[in-house]
UniProtKB/Swiss-Prot annotation:
This is Histone deacetylase 2. Residues 9-322 are annotated as: Histone deacetylase. The modification S-nitrosocysteine is found at residues 262, 274. S-nitrosylated by GAPDH. In neurons, S-nitrosylation at Cys-262 and Cys-274 does not affect enzyme activity, but induces HDAC2 release from chromatin. This in turn increases acetylation of histones surrounding neurotrophin-dependent gene promoters and promotes their transcription. In embryonic cortical neurons, S-Nitrosylation regulates dendritic growth and branching. Ca(2+) 1 binds at residues 175, 177, 179, 198-199. GO terms for molecular function: chromatin binding; enzyme binding; heat shock protein binding; histone binding; histone deacetylase activity; histone deacetylase activity, hydrolytic mechanism; histone deacetylase binding; histone decrotonylase activity. Histone deacetylase that catalyzes the deacetylation of lysine residues on the N-terminal part of the core histones (H2A, H2B, H3 and H4). Histone deacetylation gives a tag for epigenetic repression and plays an important role in transcriptional regulation, cell cycle progression and developmental events. Histone deacetylases act via the formation of large multiprotein complexes. Forms transcriptional repressor complexes by associating with MAD, SIN3, YY1 and N-COR. 1D-myo-inositol 1,4,5,6-tetrakisphosphate binds at residues 28, 32, 271. Zn(2+) binds at residues 177, 179, 265. Keywords: Acetylation, Biological rhythms, Chromatin regulator, Cytoplasm, Hydrolase, Isopeptide bond, Nucleus, Phosphoprotein, Repressor, S-nitrosylation, Transcription, Transcription regulation, Ubl conjugation. It catalyses: N(6)-acetyl-L-lysyl-[histone] + H2O = L-lysyl-[histone] + acetate; N(6)-acetyl-L-lysyl-[protein] + H2O = L-lysyl-[protein] + acetate; N(6)-(2E)-butenoyl-L-lysyl-[protein] + H2O = (2E)-2-butenoate + L-lysyl-[protein]; N(6)-(2-hydroxyisobutanoyl)-L-lysyl-[protein] + H2O = 2-hydroxy-2-methylpropanoate + L-lysyl-[protein].
Amino acid sequence: MAYSQGGGKKKVCYYYDGDIGNYYYGQGHPMKPHRIRMTHNLLLNYGLYRKMEIYRPHKATAEEMTKYHSDEYIKFLRSIRPDNMSEYSKQMQRFNVGEDCPVFDGLFEFCQLSTGGSVAGAVKLNRQQTDMAVNWAGGLHHAKKSEASGFCYVNDIVLAILELLKYHQRVLYIDIDIHHGDGVEEAFYTTDRVMTVSFHKYGEYFPGTGDLRDIGAGKGKYYAVNFPMRDGIDDESYGQIFKPIISKVMEMYQPSAVVLQCGADSLSGDRLGCFNLTVKGHAKCVEVVKTFNLPLLMLGGGGYTIRNVARCWTYETAVALDCEIPNELPYNDYFEYFGPDFKLHISPSNMTNQNTPEYMEKIKQRLFENLRMLPHAPGVQMQAIPEDAVHEDSGDEDGEDPDKRISIRASDKRIACDEEFSDSEDEGEGGRRNVADHKKGAKKARIEEDKKETEDKKTDVKEEDKSKDNSGEKTDTKGTKSEQLSNP
């Protein structure tokens, strides 16, 4: 067994594809996949690659994606391109694609890579081949069953959790993005197999969901936990509620696997955010979750001041590895992004913390009351385990041409789009997601509408769906390889 016992160092698998940074949402759009390349390059130059196994994720197939998403929606994502948008105007409106979630070159391939890393990480954890799996390209928590939302198209988190549920009776999902993890909560709102815990800004803010009183429904009642926060929360206030709540959740729910969404838009100075966390304060959440010694899938998410996203996820990779790294940044391909101080850690701003101790304590106690309503560790009848999404031969990297592996490192050095640096650093009009779209967020009616179909897909883990249309995208053994990069 790969699992480490006690508080010792953990085995960490890390998923990254060198092409991920080449995808471009468009000029002026705050979501920049380039930040994942920056993160990767920074952690390479800190030498962290020596301490973990690095894999290139397989491209998730349409068949994998329809384990949760509707066939029509995934077919649309496969078909839509910038040059044929006029043919799909009705579908674009239906699937909420166009403004916040634009059509860009390689859109479906981007979704395949993001999802592939998260699902492959879940499979590694299921096989007990690692203690922790990291996919900074994942964590796209707003995507719905048949709808894009909040810069997210395919919900890699839901798909990874469905994979974990094949082997784990109970999975805990924790979300520290500044935005409510609405897509994940919605997917599991009526089941006790998954508990969702979200710490987020609430109010006139995207997606407009995540009220304290949203606690789940049916079998899932009390299995959705929401901590609504106000502007300006700092490290001290966040730390005072995060550890007690997660500790109580662990005590009452007793999950056997954890998924942690590490959205970095909760950092101080984020282009779309309004919290005041430092990198250390954000990473404290990783430290807390890690102490419970459970299989852990760490994912990315939001984060729109990209120099700070790279700082944060690099440091959190080091935390996962129990590795101390210096505050002085090593020289890297994107060194100029980190000026003028060229340091790893950031300072909080002087913004007012509107989260008073009284408010935080009141919310904490309300959540404790809800958690006391849970039966200790609900029993689940486990069924025959279906086939893994990533096949056994996907770990065989030795057959891959070494030059092909090395070329991924070289591809990291491609020049970013001209607008990548300047767009991310000015505040501009990037807040459109939080103002114009918050009204679209409260769509709970969809839960009841899709309840039966969704429940069938997520709770019936007896076998894979054999009735799916054979004309869908096939899983190619080569295409689904999760190749380890021996020369990162």
